[in-house]
Amino acid sequence: VIEVVYLRTPFSAGNATT
């Protein structure tokens, strides 16, 4: 569900690439 987290937090978008 890391993709959802990145959608909520633009800062986490960098980690969403995993």
Swiss-Prot record:
Source organism superkingdom: Viruses
Residues where Phosphotyrosine is found: Y6
Keyword Phosphoprotein: yes
Keyword field: Capsid protein, Cytoplasmic inwards viral transport, Host nucleus, Host-virus interaction, Late protein, Microtubular inwards viral transport, Phosphoprotein, T=25 icosahedral capsid protein, Virion, Virus entry into host cell
Induction description: Expressed in the late phase of the viral replicative cycle.
GO cellular component, one term: host cell
Main location (coarse class): virion
Entries under InterPro entries matching the protein: Adenovirus_Pll_hexon_sub3 (IPR016110)
UniProt family annotation: Belongs to the adenoviridae hexon protein family.
Additional facts recorded: All late proteins expressed from the major late promoter are produced by alternative splicing and alternative polyadenylation of the same gene giving rise to non-overlapping ORFs. A leader sequence is present in the N-terminus of all these mRNAs and is recognized by the viral shutoff protein to provide expression although conventional translation via ribosome scanning from the cap has been shut off in the host cell.
Subunit and interaction comment: Homotrimer. Interacts with the capsid vertex protein; this interaction binds the peripentonal hexons to the neighboring penton base. Interacts with the hexon-linking protein; this interaction tethers the hexons surrounding the penton to those situated in the central plate of the facet. Interacts with the hexon-interlacing protein; this interaction lashes the hexons together. Interacts with host dyneins DYNC1LI1 and DYNC1I2; this interaction might be involved in intracellular microtubule-dependent transport of incoming viral capsid.
Function: Major capsid protein that self-associates to form 240 hexon trimers, each in the shape of a hexagon, building most of the pseudo T=25 capsid. Assembled into trimeric units with the help of the chaperone shutoff protein. Transported by pre-protein VI to the nucleus where it associates with other structural proteins to form an empty capsid. Might be involved, through its interaction with host dyneins, in the intracellular microtubule-dependent transport of incoming viral capsid to the nucleus.
Protein name as catalogued: Hexon protein
Organism this protein belongs to: Canine adenovirus serotype 1 (strain Utrecht)
